[in-house]
């Protein structure tokens, strides 16, 4: 092959390669255009899964629901249809209590970023249940956890996270600056109540769907405080009880009716021989029942029941199965205060079923240890101490603490009745243990009309932590 032929051959090969490359590029452009057209067209149709995957460095909220997997948030499509939670259903018939959640916050917090908290409670909308809690503006096993045994400080805040999850900066939503709080959902939005400020000038800030709607200032200038559990909603109105005045004597107690975050009515209870603090409230057949803490002089629990016009009745649980702590041994009850060991107390709850009552209480009569549920078939109206069911949920040797009620509406469960549930705070740290901090985890149970079991679901953390040594 002479030099001219070589040049012609090489040139021909280069030309063929160039043409092939051009064809491939044109094909690539056509492929990209077709793919883009398909994606653009699909945006006008609802997919079967209707799921978005959004990847960011930080957690991103879409419809306030996410699952954090590394740095990828898989965001499920969620029905955000609003309904009105009527609260007109009666409580579901139950035979016992099934474990619903356990967050193990203290155990996880020995190595993970978990908030120092107290006063956790649960509340449910028609779509989800959330754990609310009062942080101390600090993490477990960190220097700022020092001294968090204190109840009221400017660093405390009401936050919430999905039920059953340990409360951390990565899954929690800020709700309100508060050292006393309540929250509930009316079917259309979240109402939060956060109390903060100095003891003699505290102010309750009401928010509806995160927007401030009203404030309530301390009217007795003696530590305004509220439920530390969920408020109760009936037919679009939500109801809460606040206390202002001495913790060891007669105080002032008010019921507030709230619609979309605005107070529409309030009354002060006429209860000269009663003491109402930290009430646990629930709706039942269109009315609201609250079972509270008597920190003044009762070892049984006071109650107040009211309708949507705030017409109310008051009393004490009559049963000789006493529900507070400290308390005497079970014996003869009273439909007024039982004065034996009546001073001090702990937040708690009960559920009324006609003349009967489910009583939640610590197993210990003198300390916050253990927890049990007692069914007294005549305990709402009779003073004997005979009961027919006892279910253990925390052993006598394990720490407990506050407890409170919450309900799951038919709009959430699909049942034709209101499901009763409760949570138990498992307090760890100061003042009973050798740590620099005080915090808690929580467990919760819901009533079922089927088989249940006795067991102990304790906090389980091994103390002290590194920061305590």
From Swiss-Prot:
Its main location: virion. Ca(2+) binds at residues 294, 298, 324, 344. Residues 1-6 are intravirion. Residues 36-90 are annotated as: Hypervariable stalk region. Inhibited by the neuraminidase inhibitors zanamivir (Relenza) and oseltamivir (Tamiflu). These drugs interfere with the release of progeny virus from infected cells and are effective against all influenza strains. Resistance to neuraminidase inhibitors is quite rare. Keywords: Calcium, Disulfide bond, Glycoprotein, Glycosidase, Host cell membrane, Host membrane, Hydrolase, Membrane, Metal-binding, Signal-anchor, Transmembrane, Transmembrane helix, Virion. CDD domains: Influenza_NA. Disulfide bonds join 92-417, 124-129, 184-231, 233-238, 279-292, 281-290, 318-335, 421-446. It is found in: Virion membrane; Host apical cell membrane. Its cofactor is Ca(2+). N-glycosylated. It is a single-pass type II membrane protein. One of its GO terms (cellular component) is membrane. Substrate binds at residues 118, 152, 277-278, 293, 368. Residues 11-33 are annotated as: Involved in apical transport and lipid raft association. Residues 91-469 are annotated as: Head of neuraminidase. It comes from the Viruses. Pfam families: Neur. It catalyses: Hydrolysis of alpha-(2->3)-, alpha-(2->6)-, alpha-(2->8)- glycosidic linkages of terminal sialic acid residues in oligosaccharides, glycoproteins, glycolipids, colominic acid and synthetic substrates. Catalyzes the removal of terminal sialic acid residues from viral and cellular glycoconjugates. Cleaves off the terminal sialic acids on the glycosylated HA during virus budding to facilitate virus release. Additionally helps virus spread through the circulation by further removing sialic acids from the cell surface. These cleavages prevent self-aggregation and ensure the efficient spread of the progeny virus from cell to cell. Otherwise, infection would be limited to one round of replication. The influenza A genome consist of 8 RNA segments. Genetic variation of hemagglutinin and/or neuraminidase genes results in the emergence of new influenza strains. The mechanism of variation can be the result of point mutations or the result of genetic reassortment between segments of two different strains. Belongs to the glycosyl hydrolase 34 family. Intact N-terminus is essential for virion morphogenesis. Possesses two apical sorting signals, one in the ectodomain, which is likely to be a glycan, and the other in the transmembrane domain. The transmembrane domain also plays a role in lipid raft association. This is Neuraminidase. The gene is NA.
């Amino acid at each position: 092959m002479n030099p001219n032929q070589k040049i012609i051959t090489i040139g021909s090969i280069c030309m063929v390669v160039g043409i092939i490359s051009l064809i491939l590029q044109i094909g690539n452009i056509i492929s990209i255009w077709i793919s883009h057209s398909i994606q653009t067209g699909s945006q006008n149709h609802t997919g079967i899964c209707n799921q978005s995957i959004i990847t960011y460095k930080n957690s991103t909220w879409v419809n306030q629901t996410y699952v954090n997997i590394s740095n990828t948030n898989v965001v499920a499509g969620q029905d955000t249809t609003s309904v009105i939670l009527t609260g007109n259903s009666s409580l579901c018939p139950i035979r016992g209590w099934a474990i619903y959640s356990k967050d193990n916050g203290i155990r996880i917090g020995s190595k993970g970023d978990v908030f120092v908290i107290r006063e956790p409670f649960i509340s449910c909308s028609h779509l989800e249940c959330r754990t609310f809690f009062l942080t101390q503006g600090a993490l477990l096993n960190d220097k700022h956890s020092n001294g968090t045994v204190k109840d009221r400080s400017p660093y405390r805040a009401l936050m919430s996270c999905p039920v059953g999850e340990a409360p951390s900066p990565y899954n929690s939503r800020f709700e309100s600056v508060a050292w006393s709080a309540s929250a509930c959902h009316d079917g259309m939005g979240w109402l939060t109540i956060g109390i903060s400020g100095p003891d003699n000038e505290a102010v309750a800030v009401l928010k509806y769907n995160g927007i401030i709607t009203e404030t309530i200032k301390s009217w007795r200038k003696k530590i305004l405080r509220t439920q530390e559990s969920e408020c109760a909603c009936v037919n679009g109105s939500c109801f809460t009880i606040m206390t202002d005045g001495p913790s060891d004597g007669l105080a002032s107690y008010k019921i507030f009716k709230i619609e979309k975050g605005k107070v529409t009515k309030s009354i002060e209870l006429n209860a000269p021989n009663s003491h109402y603090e930290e009430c646990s409230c629930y709706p039942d057949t269109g009315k609201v029942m609250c079972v509270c803490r008597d920190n003044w002089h009762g070892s049984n629990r006071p109650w107040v029941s009211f309708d949507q016009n705030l017409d109310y009745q008051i009393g004490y649980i009559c049963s000789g199965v006493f529900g507070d702590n400290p308390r005497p041994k079970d014996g003869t009850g009273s439909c007024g205060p039982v004065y034996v060991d009546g001073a001090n107390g702990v937040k708690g709850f009960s559920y009324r079923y006609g003349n009967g009552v489910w009583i939640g209480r610590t197993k210990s009569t003198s300390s916050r240890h253990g927890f049990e549920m007692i069914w007294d078939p005549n305990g709402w109206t009779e003073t004997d101490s005979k009961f027919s069911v006892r279910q253990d949920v925390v052993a006598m040797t394990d720490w407990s603490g506050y407890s409170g009620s919450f309900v799951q509406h038919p709009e959430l469960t699909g049942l034709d009745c209101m499901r009763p549930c409760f949570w138990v705070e498992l307090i760890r740290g100061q003042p009973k243990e050798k740590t620099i901090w005080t915090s808690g985890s929580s467990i919760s149970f819901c009533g079922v009309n089927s088989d249940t079991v006795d067991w102990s679901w304790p906090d389980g953390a091994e103390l002290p932590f590194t920061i305590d040594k």
